[in-house]
């Protein structure tokens, strides 16, 4: 069970990661990351279970540049709920290197799924166990 208060901001990444000791292969893919905020633009869901520190797309892009990662899958987190705008924004800014996994409700429409696909989302996830988010 999550014992972190929603009011406690949790750092979820290293501010100064060190360069990797090995050279990654061509087309290396980071297969599961999240982006958070900035909150001034992408509100956190009131239903979230914790409050991660902002980890915007620019930090992700800088990390990937440092590590030599050329492709990535960004997974929508419960932090932003089913408003997938933060991932959509990162995909758009990623220059074709990023794809997404959207978080949707069970009653998502075919039209919304088509829209998400047109914006670079290639999968969806559901959150059946909200207490674990």
PLM-predicted stretches and their roles:
Residues 4-12, 81-133:
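Active-site gating/metal-coordination segments in enzymes
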Residues 2-82:
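An N-terminally biased module of ancient metal coordination in phosphate/nucleic-acid-related enzymes
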